Curated annotation (Swiss-Prot):
Functions in nuclear protein import as an adapter protein for nuclear receptor KPNB1. Binds specifically and directly to substrates containing either a simple or bipartite NLS motif. Docking of the importin/substrate complex to the nuclear pore complex (NPC) is mediated by KPNB1 through binding to nucleoporin FxFG repeats and the complex is subsequently translocated through the pore by an energy requiring, Ran-dependent mechanism. Forms a complex with importin subunit beta-1. This is Importin subunit alpha-6. It comes from the Eukaryota. Keywords: Cytoplasm, Host-virus interaction, Protein transport, Repeat, Transport. A motif (Nuclear localization signal) lies at residues 45-54. ARM repeats lie at residues 76-116, 117-157, 160-199, 202-242, 245-284, 287-326, 329-368, 371-410, 414-453, 460-505. GO terms for molecular function: nuclear import signal receptor activity; nuclear localization sequence binding. It comes from Homo sapiens (Human). Residues 26-40 have a biased composition (Basic and acidic residues).
């Protein structure tokens, strides 16, 4: 877990929260790679590589019309005779400019073929890729430059080995020079190629950054009035900011924050989406990176974009907001001061499960904050929705809701914890004790322990000697489940279960040799028939 909180927050939690079993660093949780599906999926919202596909047209010169939008794909068939021929290779090595252009266009059309362009055939022809790179330097022939750049773009849209060929032929520094070309088509194709190269992996990304791409790229973004160029340039910039293993050198990419903050007010959803992705990557890290993002002045606009009508904008905006609230309490408060909670409440009812899940994750990092921040979540009427999610949602979303509620029981006041109990949080927490995810079983046990601890304090203060929350847990079949957890394979879980029973329930397990069976399909423990409640232990 790469969670990170400020030292002040850690100390405060250790002193103020009695729940020593819940690691204070874990309360503020960085996004877990295995837990968030959006980045793993090939999502529509963002592609790390894009091929400029070929659409047959009558005009020979591509400079007569804007470059095709990167999100448009084509399945237009290419005539079978268009394969790499000896004539094409001879023409590309000709000294005749017209033949060079004709051959390059033929190669470009082949490389634009969907869905499987013959990249390997092209790069295996000796000297052809190097010839394309040579054509990039033909400033007197912008049409040839453009066609060569397009061909190289599509080679770089392939595998790492394909991208590596483009890098090793020395194309990257030349593409960066072409960002200052007088011809917009050439500029746009150059930035597209650089985006594909940077999008391959961290090694390629860092190579492009070390070639000093950022100053001319930011100048292009500042000066261009062409929407397709802006789209491609922002997408390339987001690829330069992307990656965690390792992340890009922050000093290399942080100068883009001012430009991103301006582009965050674009009216184009594609531009907005990639700006938000870039900000989400930049804020995914330690608190000093989060602070740099905050200082760029983007928070209020990011929160506004949570209510955008296009999910491809909402998803990365939510990711960025969620990353910012993994910071310390002061950084979290910046987001709260932008009226984020009503937006998060809205997103908790989104028809998209992935949005609901990330909204729960974001709220869980807010409830890991101070008591005033927990109260703000209460005042926003978010907890009733969280408890409903805890009861009914998909398991991956329930997990995030469990963190949100347990974090609130860990740092909340007695009144705040009583509020959660009154909303009915005990039953769904008890239901989580039977799932196969050991971490979530621990989270649920910690939440119940915090509630029981409060009940013990209240019973002593009131002189009644009875913990009012023990009965609620028993009614929810929680005691039965805690007893069975004494046979859990995880040492921390069975020790916690033993301690809870010994301290709060004053009973011993009848037969410590009983080990529940596991139903792999249901991902939960199955208890003996006579011990199970009437409605079973369903997720």
């Amino acid at each position: 877990m790469d969670a990170m909180a400020s030292p002040g927050k850690d100390n405060y939690r250790m002193k103020s929260y009695k729940n020593k079993a819940l690691n204070p660093q874990e309360m503020r949780r960085r996004r877990e790679e295995e837990g968030i599906q959006l980045r793993k999926q090939k999502r529509e919202e963002q592609l790390f590589k894009r091929r400029n596909v070929y659409l047959p047209r009558n005009d020979e010169s591509m400079l007569e019309s804007p470059i095709q939008d990167p999100d448009i794909s084509s399945t237009v068939p290419i005539p079978e005779e268009e394969v790499v021929t000896t004539d094409m290779v001879q023409m590309i090595f000709s000294n005749n400019a017209d033949q060079q252009l004709t051959a390059t266009q033929k190669f470009r059309k082949l490389l634009s073929k969907e869905p499987n362009p013959p990249i390997d055939q092209v790069i295996q022809k000796p000297g052809v890729v190097q010839r394309f790179v040579k054509f990039l330097e033909r400033n007197e022939n912008c049409t040839l430059q453009f066609e060569a750049a397009w061909a190289l773009t599509n080679i770089a849209s392939g595998t790492f080995l394909h991208t590596k060929v483009v890098i090793e032929t020395g194309a990257v520094p030349i593409f960066i020079k072409l960002l200052n070309s007088e011809h917009e088509d050439v500029q746009e194709q150059a930035v597209w190629a650089l985006g594909n190269i940077a999008g391959d992996n961290a090694e390629c990304r860092d190579f492009v950054l070390n070639c000093e791409i950022l100053p001319p790229l930011l100048e292009l973004l500042t000066n261009s009035n062409r929407l397709t160029t802006t789209r491609n340039a922002v997408w390339a910039l987001s690829n330069l900011c992307r990656g965690k293993n390792p992340p890009p050198n922050f000093s290399k990419v942080s100068p883009c924050l001012n430009v991103l903050s301006r582009l965050l007010f674009s009216s184009d959803p594609d531009v907005l989406a990639d700006v938000c992705w870039a900000l989400s990557y930049l804020s995914d890290g330690p608190n000093d990176k989060i602070q740099a993002v905050i200082d760029s002045g983007v928070c209020r606009r990011l929160v506004e974009l949570l209510m955008h009508n296009d999910y491809k904008v909402v998803s990365p905006a939510l990711r960025a907001v969620g990353n910012i609230v993994t910071g310390d309490d002061i950084q979290t408060q910046v987001i709260l001061n932008c009226s984020a909670l009503p937006c998060l409440l809205h997103l908790l009812s989104s028809p998209k499960e992935s949005i609901r899940k990330e909204a729960c994750w974001t709220v869980s990092n807010i409830t890991a904050g101070n008591r005033a921040q927990i109260q703000a979540v209460i005042d926003a009427n978010i907890f009733p929705v969280l408890i409903e999610i805890l009861q009914k949602a998909e398991f991956r979303t329930r997990k995030e809701a469990a963190w949100a509620i347990t974090n609130a029981t860990s740092g909340g006041t007695p009144e705040q914890i009583r509020y959660l109990v009154a909303l009915g949080c005990i039953k769904p927490l008890c239901d989580l004790l039977t799932v196969m995810d050991s971490k979530i079983v621990q989270v649920a046990l910690n939440g119940l322990e915090n509630i029981l601890r409060l009940g013990e304090q209240e019973s002593k203060q009131n002189g009644i000697g009875i913990n009012p929350y023990c009965a609620l847990i028993e009614e929810a079949y929680g005691l039965d489940k805690i007893e069975f957890l004494q046979s859990h394979e995880n040492q921390e879980i069975y020790q916690k279960a033993f301690d809870l029973i010994e301290h709060y329930f004053g009973v011993e397990e009848d037969d410590p040799s009983i080990v529940p069976q596991v139903d792999e399909n249901q991902q939960q423990f199955i208890f003996q028939q006579q011990e199970a409640p009437m409605d079973g232990f369903q997720l």
